[in-house]
Amino acid sequence: MRFFLSPPHMGGNELKYIEEVFKSNYIAPLGEFVNRFEQSVKAYSKSENALALNSATAALHLALRVAGVKQDDIVLASSFTFIASVAPICYLKAKPVFIDCDETYNIDVDLLKLAIKECEKKPKALILTHLYGNAAKMDEIVEICKENEIVLIEDAAEALGSFYKNKALGTFGEFGAYSYNGNKIITTSGGGMLIGKNKEKIEKARFYSTQARENCLHYEHLDYGYNYRLSNVLGAIGVAQMEVLEQRVLKKREIYEWYKEFLGECFSFLDELENSRSNRWLSTALIDFDKNELNSCQKDINISQKNITLHPKISKLIEDLKNEQIETRPLWKAMHAQEVFKGAKAYLNGNSELFFQKGICLPSGTAMSKDDVYEISKLILKSIKA
């Protein structure tokens, strides 16, 4: 049997709702199911406003634009993340400043303070990624952004269904972004959602997402926009998937605990932040890891760190499992270490490099059974002990 990292898992009503869309012949972007999808996300997250889009990247791009980010503005960002979290900074020709992570996989608060203090000019925004569904230290980060008048944009692409102090991740900042990509906890095959506190700004983002067409009989444009809206067909899938979101979160968390049970003697599993609930989008584990290795040392590095290699056991494990039709991956390679960002300013402590070297993402599909996880775990132990 083949095991993927995080495959789609349909809830039951997807085909029913898609059939309704086809019967209506309204298969273009926008429509009843897009509206229902937005309403379901608002209800679940308790966010004031929601805008369905074709990706979380589009959501982050629009958030930056309506936040007023322009060329040469400074945007702070998590370094330990996927490139889609930070690429929109480049779309607007702004300057990313990368911040390394702490023991939660998320932005190190002390490094964030240092970056703000030393920036050549006041940063315009912070894109904060909640990696693998884990909550960042929101009390401190929200306060820091408030004190320094920095727009907080939460990249909650991996964190739908995650909470901190009973508040949904993505709803702490001025804007939040969720992903419905094919590998996320629920999916529309491809899609995203921008949520936010300010209705006027979300409506401005909505305007930009539909090519910035003015309200005229003809096509009139006073500004440029994008083709970022979501299809009504995909909206129908989203409505059905939102119906089973909580079930998926509980199953992801169960899978994580199974891995801890079977692999805990040989791997380390990071704890959740106190008063938080991670959706455990992907179960991640660290080999030959000691928490004392984590570095709180602060240093400012202005060059990319390119010579980072995987732990030999991780490289071997990924290949061994691939031969068994089991998909795994290393943890994200940090943005400051990517060639495309060579020369970008970064505040580092070495933690993201350590996690990349020693970490692995394990199969986390919500259709898996405990027996499946046990069999995968046996193969993992066989590989690392060989």
Curated annotation (Swiss-Prot):
Regions crossing the membrane: none
Family: Belongs to the DegT/DnrJ/EryC1 family.
Catalytic reaction(s) noted: UDP-N-acetylbacillosamine + 2-oxoglutarate = UDP-2-acetamido-2,6-dideoxy-alpha-D-xylo-hex-4-ulose + L-glutamate
CDD domains: AHBA_syn
SUPFAM superfamilies listed in its UniProt record: PLP-dependent transferases (SSF53383)
Residues with N6-(pyridoxal phosphate)lysine modification: 184
Top-level EC class: transferase
Disruption phenotype: Cells are impaired for flagella-mediated motility, for invasion of intestinal epithelial cells and for persistence in the chicken intestine.
EC number(s) given by UniProt: 2.6.1.34
Any matching Pfam family: DegT_DnrJ_EryC1
Pathway(s): Protein modification; protein glycosylation
Name of the molecule in the record: UDP-N-acetylbacillosamine transaminase
Superkingdom of the organism of origin: Bacteria
UniProt xrefs under InterPro entries: DegT/StrS_aminotransferase, PyrdxlP-dep_Trfase, PyrdxlP-dep_Trfase_major, PyrdxlP-dep_Trfase_small
One example of a Gene Ontology biological process annotation: protein glycosylation
Known role: Aminotransferase involved in the bacillosamine biosynthesis pathway by producing UDP-4-amino-4,6-dideoxy-alpha-D-GlcNAc (UDP-2-acetamido-4-amino-2,4,6-trideoxy-alpha-D-glucopyranose), a precursor used in the production of the glycan component 2,4-diacetamido-2,4,6-trideoxy-alpha-D-glucopyranose. Required for host colonization and virulence. Involved in the N-linked protein glycosylation pathway.
Cell membrane listed as a keyword: no
